[in-house]
């Protein structure tokens, strides 16, 4: 990308958009956004595997922006498979204001037990630890954690594919298409199926590199969406034994 770290894959709009409601919070602090669709998009078949950032902006307020990250899962065989830590992104996500899996803004001590759920159906707001950078709003932890390694790997010419935590949970065959799984920086929240799939692949010869700290620390349990019934749209942390 000539040092730019990425390239423009496409653009669209403008779109007519209204104010979407902030969903009510359940007893487990779960907020699920059952919003009206402003626009939809089908990923073209010729797009390569990668981590993409859709940047949303307002035509009436220049400079107001937010990202929407998404992963195009690898379909081809690659030497390396970089897994983004999207479950950890959501665990620390404080959208709409203070509601991460750790706290609700009511006290100085973080909660580390069970019985708190977070939904994947909500935007990424401010990340509740380490970094407060308005220009990264909406990107989860990607620009903080994954991007520096991805930038370097692609600049060095490595053969890289990409997947999300959710891909590893739902599709063990994603590991059949690579020689090595790479976990980056802060990959804290894993499901049992993720762990079992990675372990089975390792026993079959897959290499696994954890270029990270605090990895595979919390086991989670997935739940179906309370609004659509779609599987694996919310999760809770299991109690540490």
Where are these regions (language model features)?
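Glycine-rich, phosphate-binding/catalytic loops in enzymes
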Residues: 98-100, 198-200, 227
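An acidic, glycine-rich "communication" segment
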Residues: 216-241
């Amino acid at each position: 990308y000539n040092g730019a770290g990425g390239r423009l894959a496409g653009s669209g709009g403008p779109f007519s958009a209204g104010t979407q409601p902030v969903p009510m919070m359940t007893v487990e602090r779960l907020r699920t956004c059952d919003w009206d669709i402003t626009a939809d998009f089908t990923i073209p078949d010729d797009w390569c595997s990668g981590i993409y950032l859709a940047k949303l902006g307002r035509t009436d307020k220049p400079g107001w922006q937010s990202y929407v990250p998404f992963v195009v899962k690898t379909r081809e065989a690659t030497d390396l498979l970089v897994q983004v830590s999207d479950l950890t992104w959501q665990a620390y996500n404080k959208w709409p204001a203070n509601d991460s899996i750790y706290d609700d803004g009511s006290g100085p001590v973080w909660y580390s037990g069970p019985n708190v759920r977070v939904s994947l159906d909500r935007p990424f707001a401010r990340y509740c630890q380490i970094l407060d950078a308005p220009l990264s709003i909406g990107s989860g932890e990607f620009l903080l954690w994954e991007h520096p390694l991805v930038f370097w790997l692609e600049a060095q010419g490595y053969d890289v594919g990409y997947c999300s935590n959710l891909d590893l949970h739902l599709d063990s065959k994603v590991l059949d298409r690579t020689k090595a799984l790479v976990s980056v920086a802060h990959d804290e929240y894993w499901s049992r199926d993720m762990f079992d799939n990675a372990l089975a692949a390792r026993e079959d010869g897959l290499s696994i590199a954890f270029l990270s700290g605090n990895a595979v620390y919390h086991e989670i349990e997935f739940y179906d969406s309370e609004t659509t019934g779609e599987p694996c749209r919310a999760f809770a942390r299991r109690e540490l034994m």
